[in-house]
């Protein structure tokens, strides 16, 4: 059974420079850590939550270990300088799935996300495998049932697989099916897709679903496509699979990318999303601390989370 736990205060530690000036602060000094899951108390804040689950990665024959991602990313975030926007972060703990019940874990996350959004918060979720996206995305769809929701995925993989049960490779097919069941349009864009890592069947599925697809080779010149997608929806859910980055920047994932999209290009792509006023939910997924020997990959991932919170309007 999926359970909720508050984040350990030991994760939020860092260098104290406050003697220099009142605003010489780091995230560990400005993040609010909640001992209860109580989003109703934190309107207009950003709910930082962990989804400590990699059952979907295991089912997808990937490298397990992403369940340790949320706490590793908290540690990496803790010592980063606190700037505008970061004071809005409220750590609402981890959803932990100690059993293979992926479906139950996704439902728990879905309910939590919907509750946060309906309470007037926005959500920043640290995965976990990309199975995080179904629970997170479904919660967004639930919270904004009368509005068009755009799903923007930065990922080497389309994650539209067809299997007999949910995995880390199926979340966007699941979200498409959920939209079908709710008689609403499925607005999905995937940037950074590796043609070498997706079969023709997956490309055909993306075409049939009218997915906006931008390959890794073309992301250097994709801002117009991003802006066009932003303009056509009311609300946005942004999900970043860290395997969109090149292996030399992000080795600590289930399926490292031989080519990938460099971090600077990813940041340029997500900036207009964050500043659009439409972003309601974001996540970083697939970080696997077992393959991060010196913590450098955690800092790369944390920089993305740091930047999202800073730019979020």
UniProtKB/Swiss-Prot annotation:
Pathway, according to UniProt? Amino-acid degradation; L-histidine degradation into L-glutamate; L-glutamate from N-formimidoyl-L-glutamate (hydrolase route): step 1/1
Among SUPFAM superfamilies, the record links this protein to:
Arginase/deacetylase
Q: Which Gene3D superfamilies match?
A: Ureohydrolase domain
Q: Which UniProt keywords apply?
A: Histidine metabolism, Hydrolase, Manganese, Metal-binding
Q: Which Gene Ontology molecular-function terms are recorded? A: agmatinase activity; formimidoylglutamase activity; manganese ion binding
* Catalyzed reaction equations: N-formimidoyl-L-glutamate + H2O = formamide + L-glutamate
Please, which domain of life does this record's source organism belong to?
Bacteria
**Positions bound to Mn(2+) 2:** 155, 157, 241, 243
InterPro entries in the record, alphabetically? Answer: HutG, Ureohydrolase, Ureohydrolase_dom_sf
Instruction: Recite the UniProt cofactor note for this protein.
Output: Binds 2 manganese ions per subunit.
Cofactor(s) this protein cannot do without: Mn(2+)
PROSITE patterns listed in its UniProt record = ARGINASE_2
* E.C. number(s) listed in UniProt: 3.5.3.8
Query: Which residues bind Mn(2+) 1 per the record?
Result: 130, 155, 159, 241
Its GO biological process annotations read: L-histidine catabolic process to glutamate and formamide; L-histidine catabolic process to glutamate and formate; putrescine biosynthetic process from arginine, via agmatine
Q: Which HAMAP family match?
A: Formimidoylglutam
Family label: Belongs to the arginase family.
Function comment:
Catalyzes the conversion of N-formimidoyl-L-glutamate to L-glutamate and formamide.
Name of this protein: Formimidoylglutamase
């Amino acid at each position: 059974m999926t359970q909720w736990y508050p984040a350990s205060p030991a994760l939020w530690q860092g260098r104290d420079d406050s003697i220099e000036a009142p605003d010489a602060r780091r995230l560990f000094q400005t993040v609010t850590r909640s001992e209860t899951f109580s989003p109703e108390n934190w309107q207009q804040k950003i709910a930082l939550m962990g989804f400590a689950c990699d059952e979907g990665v295991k089912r997808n024959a990937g490298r397990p270990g992403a369940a340790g991602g949320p706490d590793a990313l908290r540690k990496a975030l803790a010592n980063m300088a606190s700037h505008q926007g970061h004071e809005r972060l409220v750590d609402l703990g981890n959803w932990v799935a100690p059993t293979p019940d992926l479906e139950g874990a996704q439902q728990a996350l879905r309910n939590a996300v919907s509750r946060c959004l309906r309470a007037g918060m926005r959500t920043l979720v640290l995965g976990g495998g990309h199975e995080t996206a179904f629970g997170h995305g479904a919660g967004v769809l639930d919270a904004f049932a009368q509005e068009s929701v755009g799903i923007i995925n930065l990922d080497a993989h389309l994650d539209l697989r067809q299997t007999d049960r949910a995995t880390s490779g199926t979340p966007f097919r699941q979200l498409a099916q959920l939209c079908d069941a709710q008689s609403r349009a499925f607005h999905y864009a995937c940037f950074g897709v590796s043609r070498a890592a997706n079969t023709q069947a997956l490309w055909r599925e993306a075409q049939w679903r009218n997915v906006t697809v931008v390959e890794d080779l073309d992301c250097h010149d994709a801002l117009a496509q991003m802006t066009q997608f932003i303009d056509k929806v009311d609300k946005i859910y942004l999900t970043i699979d860290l395997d969109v980055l090149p292996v030399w920047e992000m080795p600590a994932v289930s399926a490292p990318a031989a080519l990938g999209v460099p971090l600077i290009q990813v940041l340029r792509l997500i900036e207009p999303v964050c500043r659009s006023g439409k972003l309601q939910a974001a996540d970083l997924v697939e970080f696997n601390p077992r393959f991060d020997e010196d913590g450098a990959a955690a800092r790369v991932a944390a920089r993305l989370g740091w930047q999202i919170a800073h730019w979020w309007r």
